[in-house]
Amino acid sequence: RVGYLIAKPEIASKLRENVVANTNVLAIQAAITAMNDNEFYNFSLKKVNEGKALMYKAFDELNLEYIRSNTNFIFFKTGRPIQTFNQQMKAEGVLVGRPFPPYEDWCRVSMGTIEEVQLFNKALKKIFS
């Protein structure tokens, strides 16, 4: 996993103090190559946005509160302990995010393929209907 930060120098300097691991040369080169692949970037962005639109629609239909996201994941309120929700989704063949204290009834779900998002929505509707 490779990440990067765009920040003011003083903030980047402060954050750099907490870096716990170095990234190897192969990972860095792979990240640079990926960042320069505009066609794949645009394809991925399109698919993530399509997935989020499908999830937003399901959340709206079920009246579930959620936070609109500029990332590849969505944070939404389940209204039940996350451990309970995780078990319910797992029983439907879907694995979802870990707890994010103190938001014990919220779930973070990452985008997958459109087919995976559809499976997620089907399980979600079964659990909340």
Features from the language model and the residues they span:
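PLP-dependent enzyme catalytic core of the Aspartate aminotransferase-like
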Residues: 87-96, 100-129
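Short, hinge-like loop/turn segments at secondary-structure boundaries
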Residues: 3-6, 85, 115-116
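PLP-dependent aminotransferase class I/II
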Residues: 1-59, 64-67
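Conserved PLP-binding catalytic core of the aspartate aminotransferase-like
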Residues: 49, 53, 58-92, 111
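A generic structural signal for well-ordered coil/turn residues at beta-strand boundaries
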Residues: 1, 70-72, 103-105
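Internal amphipathic alpha-helical segments of the cytochrome P450 catalytic fold
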Residues: 12, 41-42, 82, 86, ...
